[in-house]
UniProtKB/Swiss-Prot annotation:
Residues engaged in binding substrate: R169, W176, D177, N213, R222, S223, Q224, R294, P295, E296, G327, E526
Cited function: Provides the cells with the ability to utilize trehalose at high osmolarity by splitting it into glucose molecules that can subsequently be taken up by the phosphotransferase-mediated uptake system.
Active-site residues, as the UniProt record annotates them: D329 (proton donor/acceptor), E511 (proton donor/acceptor)
One of the Pfam families matching this protein, by short name: Trehalase
Species classification: Bacteria, Pseudomonadati, Pseudomonadota, Gammaproteobacteria, Lysobacterales
Keywords associated with the record: Glycosidase, Hydrolase, Periplasm, Signal
Protein name, as recorded: Periplasmic trehalase
Length: 568
């Protein structure tokens, strides 16, 4: 199939994953074939062929889907796409088309008769007198799901082992969330469950060729920040170095997914997740296979695209989807004017955090090769080194911090964000760059409640004034790696105090936090604040271990205990 230029410098390709591709000056043929080694078997089913991709709700019953979402039948656009059709979706849609014009037709009654509702994850039936650490230990069982078989027509994807969901509206496993959740599981001694989650992600790679955003059909067209190598590293800390070789095949497939399309991309062009800069350097961006509204946010996306007059709607949809893949949905980082979602251009941005994670993946692949010093180990290490050089050349702001790069306008962002600490977390920063980044962060992003996501207020949830548990951990861990103990402690203790304060008032942990003194949970975004909450639980346990005395023994303020009926 010939390449189709979707927009300036953006090449769409249907090519297979790279097998002999020039990446950062090295040929992939030097190490992909030699490194396809026999590894220890996974404790997961052997997958002989890719699983058929199930239709998404907007594909399975398009007219009914649009009627429900555009009619705002439910407050949350994700609610309906998680419903279980009780019979063949094609028949349901046909019945809708035959009946919807009839006098007295009731759309809500039609949906109720043909679908089973998926309730949110309930976490509020725990004793009210528990201390924070005990509360988290009691939360884990409430967040565990086991779905090795799902009913026909469900948007949920089956997984062979139990897994932990975030909580609230998030009834499925999420890729990057899970690393921070797994940190907490290991800290809680639940290493078997942590291993099972890692095996689930290996299964998804083997089954679909990548780890999707989450285990839903409507998430299959994209991934999320690539933390699989960090998960392998975490489990190796539990089981030993053999873990690296066990997951080598899946690490290679993960890398191939993110580098797919690099075979033919020319300087100044992009293909899928890959961008080749004018000097030949190859870095990565976020991207999505589809360029339609997200089913789980259909009305939000169509309204955003309708505000854009100078770009095709398909471009806007892909940028919205790519923003969802980034995990930062949404933020001023992706906005051309820094304020309005209608100016989103995620696919034009080379993010510092994504490329730091891929550096770690390359380093992990080098380590995972069977013999130290083998050709594949040297070649993956060389790729990591060349990515580091490209990051230093293009993503380092001389004002003293790492930033994102716009490959279309060839400009480096002047915005400082929490993502600037990812190079420290990945261990790629020089001592000088780490010191200067820490100094800039100390001046610009430290708040009474921890590390700010950005210094810009837009109303988007990944901007000021919100703080997010995963970014606190990336900061604390990265700063500690480079000897910035005082700043790490300041961020960690302040965020932990914020978590403890809200827990004392409301007896819950939430998805995001406001960072001002005595602030409530964070705001903004496309949905209400969620509690549970997987990654907050994991990071909180890590911080309690690092900085004991900051809420480790404190119990919440006394409250009137809800009855079980009220909790339900």
């Amino acid at each position: 199939m010939p390449h189709v230029v979707a927009r300036s410098g953006d090449v769409m390709s249907s090519a297979a994953p790279p097998s002999c591709t020039s990446l950062l000056g090295l040929s992939l043929s030097m190490f992909v074939a030699p490194c396809t080694l026999t590894a220890a078997p996974l404790d997961t089913p052997v997958v002989n062929a890719p699983a058929p991709t199930p239709p998404t709700p907007d594909q399975a019953y398009p007219e009914l889907f649009q009627a429900v979402q555009s009619g705002e039948l439910f407050d949350d656009q994700k609610h309906f796409v998680d419903f279980l059709p009780l019979r063949d979706p094609a028949l349901i849609n046909a019945d809708y088309l035959a009946q919807h014009d009839h006098p007295g037709f009731d759309l809500r009654k039609f949906v109720d008769a043909n679908f089973e509702e998926s309730p949110p994850v309930q976490t509020d039936a725990i004793r009210q007198d528990t201390a924070l650490r005990e509360h988290i230990d009691l939360l884990w069982p409430k967040l565990v799901r086991s779905q090795n078989h799902v009913p026909p027509y469900s948007s949920l994807l089956s997984l062979p082992h139990p897994y932990v969901v975030p909580g609230g509206r998030f009834r499925e496993v999420y890729y990057w969330d899970s690393y921070f959740t797994m940190l907490g599981l290991v800290k809680s001694g639940q290493t078997t469950l942590s291993r099972q989650m890692l095996d689930n992600f290996a299964y998804l790679i083997d089954t679909y060729g990548h780890i999707p955003n989450g285990n839903r059909s409507y998430y299959l067209s994209r991934s999320q920040p690539p933390f699989f190598s960090y998960m392998v590293e975490l489990q190796a800390g539990v089981e030993g170095q053999a873990v690296y070789q066990r997951y080598l095949p899946q690490l290679q497939k993960e890398y191939a997914y993110w580098m797919q399309g690099s075979d033919d991309v020319q300087p100044g062009q992009a293909a899928r997740h890959v961008v080749r800069l004018a000097d030949g350097s190859v870095l990565n961006r976020y991207w999505d296979e589809r360029d339609t509204p997200r089913p789980e946010a259909w009305l939000h996306d169509t309204r955003t695209a309708a505000e854009v007059k100078d770009r095709p709607a398909a471009e806007v949809y892909r940028d919205l989807r790519a923003g969802a893949e980034s995990g930062w949905d949404y933020t001023s980082r992706w906005l051309a004017d820094g304020q309005n979602l209608r100016t989103i251009r995620t696919t034009a941005i080379i993010p510092i955090d994504l490329n730091s994670l891929l550096y770690h993946l390359e380093r992990t692949l080098a380590q995972a090769c069977a013999q130290p010093g083998a050709a594949c180990s040297r070649d993956y290490a060389a790729l990591a080194q060349q990515r580091k050089q490209a990051i230093d050349a293009h993503l380092w702001n001389k004002a003293g911090y790492y930033a994102d790069y716009d490959w279309q306008t060839r400009t480096l962002s002047d915005q400082i964000t929490a993502a600037a600490l990812y190079p420290l977390f990945a261990g790629l920063a020089s001592d000088d760059h780490a010191k200067r980044t820490a100094s800039t962060v100390r001046r610009t992003l430290v708040r009474p409640g921890g590390l700010a996501t950005t210094a810009v207020k837009t109303g988007q949830q990944w901007d000021e004034p919100n703080g997010w548990a995963p970014l606190q951990w990336v900061a604390v861990d990265g700063l500690r790696r480079y000897g910035e103990q005082a700043l790490a402690r300041t961020i960690g203790e302040r965020f932990l105090a914020q978590v403890q304060a809200l827990f004392a008032r409301e007896h819950k942990l939430v998805e995001k936090y406001g960072l001002e003194t005595n602030a409530a949970g964070g705001g903004g975004g496309e949905y209400a604040l969620q509690d549970g909450f997987g990654w907050t639980n994991g990071v909180t346990l890590m911080l309690l271990n690092l900085y004991p005395g900051k809420g480790a023994k404190a119990a919440p303020a006394k409250r009137v205990r809800k009855t079980e009926a009220a909790a339900r």
